[in-house]
Amino acid sequence: MKARNKRLMLVGGGIALLVAAAALVLSAFQQNLVFFHTPSEVAEGKAPVGKTFRVGGMVETGSIQRDADGVTVRFVITDTAKVIPVSYRGSLPDLFKEGKGAVVQGTLGADGQFRATEVLAKHDENYMPPEAAHALEQAHKTATTVQQ
């Protein structure tokens, strides 16, 4: 085999390997990509049925219901224009409350029910962990202040 043919085969093999690696990376990226939709987009049919995505909004006041099994929770996410019924099986975050922001990840069923596999509670910029709030309260009670 001539040197030129060897070089062409080597370059061709290298390009084929690069294309295969790029295809694998794109495939893995596409499988792990999770889109975010609002309740209005979901209600308008812009969200894929049966595929994993996230919905964010406010937990509608008075919508939280716990099933008899004590593990399944049903609630409604709204963006004040449309509502999406959500069912979730598991323990909810401590910050999850009615009237507060939440993001749920899961799939939309053909019946319009969103089946969440993960619930994330949002908090505002004034959030303080309970331990820090307690320490601050104790400091105020003992009148401990930092002097400059």
UniProtKB/Swiss-Prot annotation:
- Keyword flag Metal-binding: yes
Q: Which domain of life is it from?
A: Bacteria
The entry's keywords: Cell inner membrane, Cell membrane, Cytochrome c-type biogenesis, Heme, Iron, Membrane, Metal-binding, Signal-anchor, Transmembrane, Transmembrane helix
Sequence intervals crossing the membrane: 8-28
Q: InterPro entries from the xrefs?
A: CcmE, CcmE-like_sf, NA-bd_OB-fold
> Could you tell me where this protein is found in the cell?
Cell inner membrane
| Cytoplasmic compartment residues | 1-7
Its Gene Ontology cellular component terms are: plasma membrane
One of the entry's Gene Ontology molecular-function terms is: metal ion binding
Instruction: State where heme binds.
Output: H123, Y127
Instruction: Give the record's GO biological process terms.
Output: cytochrome complex assembly
Q: Which residues lie on this side of the membrane: Periplasmic?
A: 29-148
Family matches, as NCBIfam families: PRK13254.1-1 (NF009727), PRK13254.1-3 (NF009729), PRK13254.1-5 (NF009731)
Outline what the protein does: Heme chaperone required for the biogenesis of c-type cytochromes. Transiently binds heme delivered by CcmC and transfers the heme to apo-cytochromes in a process facilitated by CcmF and CcmH.
Concerning HAMAP family, the annotation shows: CcmE (MF_01959)
Protein name, UniProt field? Cytochrome c-type biogenesis protein CcmE
